[in-house]
C-alpha cells in the first residue's frame, strides 16, 4: 500500500507543448510539459534531415565499401589511363 501524502500529484491528461502549440497529451506529474523538439518538427522524423559531412568521411566510407558517392553531385574520379608501352616492348 502506498504511503499517503508522499507521492506527487498525477495528471493523466498533461499537455505537451511545443512552440506554443499543444502537440499531444500524456500522463505526467506536471500539468504542462514544454519541449523544444518533438517528432513532428524534428528533421529525422520529417524526412528533411541532411548529412553534414565536413571532412569527407561519408564519401570515404562509401568509396571504401564500394557504394559509390554519398553526394550524387560529386563526380567520381576519372579512371587512370593505361600506362604507355615502353620502346623495349614495342620492338619485340
From Swiss-Prot:
Q: Where is the composition biased (Low complexity)?
A: 70-80
Q: Check the record and name the PROSITE patterns matching this protein.
A: RIBOSOMAL_L31
Q: Name one GO molecular function term.
A: rRNA binding
Keyword entries, A-Z: Ribonucleoprotein, Ribosomal protein, RNA-binding, rRNA-binding
Q: Which GO terms describe its biological process?
A: translation
Q: Where is this region: Disordered?
A: 66-92
Pfam families per record: Ribosomal_L31
InterPro entries recorded for this chain? Ribosomal_bL28/bL31-like_sf (IPR034704), Ribosomal_bL31 (IPR002150), Ribosomal_bL31_A (IPR027491), Ribosomal_bL31_sf (IPR042105)
What's an example GO cellular component term for this entry?
Answer: ribonucleoprotein complex
Q: Carries keyword Ribonucleoprotein?
A: yes
Name the HAMAP family on file. Answer: Ribosomal_bL31_1
- Describe its partners and assembly state: Part of the 50S ribosomal subunit.
Q: What does this protein do?
A: Binds the 23S rRNA.
Family affiliation = Belongs to the bacterial ribosomal protein bL31 family. Type A subfamily.
Q: What is this protein called?
A: Large ribosomal subunit protein bL31
Gene source species = Synechococcus sp. (strain RCC307)
**Classification of source organism:** Bacteria, Bacillati, Cyanobacteriota, Cyanophyceae, Synechococcales
The gene from which this protein is expressed is rpmE
Amino acid at each position: 500500500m502506498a504511503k499517503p501524502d508522499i507521492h506527487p500529484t498525477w495528471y493523466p491528461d498533461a499537455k505537451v507543448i511545443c512552440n506554443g502549440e499543444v502537440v499531444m497529451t500524456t500522463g505526467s506529474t506536471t500539468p504542462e510539459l514544454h519541449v523544444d523538439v518533438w517528432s513532428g518538427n524534428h528533421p529525422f522524423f520529417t524526412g528533411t534531415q541532411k548529412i553534414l559531412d565536413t571532412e569527407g568521411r561519408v564519401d570515404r566510407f562509401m568509396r571504401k565499401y564500394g557504394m559509390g558517392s554519398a553526394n550524387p553531385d560529386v563526380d567520381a574520379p576519372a579512371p587512370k589511363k593505361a600506362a604507355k608501352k615502353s620502346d623495349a616492348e614495342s620492338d619485340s
